[in-house]
Curated annotation (Swiss-Prot):
Lineage: Eukaryota, Fungi, Dikarya, Ascomycota, Saccharomycotina
Keywords: Cytoplasm, Nucleus, Protein transport, Transport
Pfam families in alphabetical order: Cut8
The protein, known as: Tethering factor for nuclear proteasome STS1
GO MF annotation, one: proteasome binding
Organism of provenance: Kluyveromyces lactis (strain ATCC 8585 / CBS 2359 / DSM 70799 / NBRC 1267 / NRRL Y-1140 / WM37) (Yeast)
Function text: Involved in ubiquitin-mediated protein degradation. Regulatory factor in the ubiquitin/proteasome pathway that controls the turnover of proteasome substrates. Targets proteasomes to the nucleus and facilitates the degradation of nuclear proteins.
InterPro entries to which the protein is assigned, alphabetical: Cut8/Sts1_fam, Cut8/Sts1_sf
Length: 333
């Protein structure tokens, strides 16, 4: 019987070869000394035959250790030819740049600098629509900014120019009297509505009590009325509806400014300049087809009241020290 030595080889000899080897060893120990050489030769023959069978894989009980995978070395890569190039390409690692600079969005102040007026207005209005809670804060900020008459006039000129640019080019757009047809109104309606709404918004923000100067209010009112008279008319009466409504509102604004000026004590000594503003209104009323008749009638009422108060002062000298409530502005100042 064989004894274990504490480890196993990479292969184990077959059972038949092992038994024959043991039998040969027993025979060599029991024979006489004169047969020792023959027994050694026989045992040696059995060992060679068993090694030959194991070498050619005839044993069915071959046991081997699992082979461990290893990486290709530089020598293996150089010896394998085309295969080595593929392995080298797969196993190659790309360099990793850890300290590289990434792009970043443009800061908000720089973005605002690059925006034009239309884009900035669109972004601001969309922001207010999406977040109505900020409307009050934005409104407070805007109200703290004061705008002058020149800025108002510039914007109105641009919008009036846009109205004329929207007139379609066709010889059939105008009639013999210069009125535009329905097709032209359909093309121009958006710009006309924008102009009319802008006129009313600017006027309401430039009259008392929003404005402290009645003189500036009347001057801008005169300019706005002149712009409105330049708006084209249309053949169909319904297409002139928006323009007529705007004239009605402007007529009421004229009356409000006139009443405010007449009750302002700081202008009580300039009643003689009332004729200047009356002349301006007569000119505007003639161009607008008598749509400003109401403020003209109000001026006539104020003139009559001023004349009556003047007669009272002449008949009662003591009343001259009492302040008068009638006053107006000088358009030329």
């Amino acid at each position: 019987m064989s004894q274990s030595v504490g480890f196993e080889w990479g292969f184990r000899p077959s059972v038949s070869s092992g038994e024959n080897l043991n039998m040969g060893q027993e025979q060599t120990s029991s024979t006489e000394s004169n047969d020792i050489s023959n027994d050694h030769e026989r045992a040696h023959g059995h060992i060679q035959s068993s090694q030959h069978r194991l070498t050619h894989g005839t044993s069915s009980r071959r046991i081997s250790k699992p082979r461990i995978k290893r990486r290709y070395t530089e020598e293996d890569v150089s010896m394998n030819g085309p295969v080595s190039q593929v392995v080298q390409r797969v196993s190659k690692k790309k360099p990793v740049y850890r300290n590289y600079i990434q792009g970043q969005p443009l800061p908000f102040p720089r973005s605002v600098e690059l925006m034009d007026k239309q884009l900035l207005q669109s972004v601001l209005l969309s922001l207010v629509r999406e977040h109505p809670e900020i409307q009050h804060s934005l409104f407070s900020k805007v109200q703290s900014i004061s705008f002058n008459k020149e800025q108002y006039v510039k914007v109105l000129k641009e919008k009036l120019t846009q109205v004329y640019e929207d007139i379609p080019y066709s010889k059939y757009n105008q009639s013999s009297d210069g009125l535009l047809n329905d097709y032209a109104f359909g093309r121009m309606k958006a710009s006309i509505m924008e102009f009319l709404n802008c006129v009313i918004d600017f006027l309401l923000s430039s009259i008392p009590p929003q404005s402290d100067s009645v003189l500036q209010s009347l001057k801008f009112l005169n300019c706005s009325t002149d712009f409105l008279n330049q708006l084209p008319d249309f053949e169909t009466a319904s297409n002139n509806y928006y323009k007529n409504m705007c004239f009605e509102q402007i007529s009421e604004i004229w009356c409000s400014c006139i009443q405010f000026a007449s009750t302002d004590l700081s202008f009580m000594s300039v009643v003689s300049n009332l004729e200047d503003w009356e002349s301006v209104l007569h000119t505007l009323n003639g161009r607008s087809n008598n749509r400003l008749q109401k403020p003209l009638e109000l001026i006539g009422t104020i003139k009559n009241s001023a004349a009556m108060m003047s007669q009272d002062r002449n008949g009662h000298p003591l009343s001259q020290t009492q302040p008068s409530t009638v006053g107006f502005l000088n358009i030329s100042s």
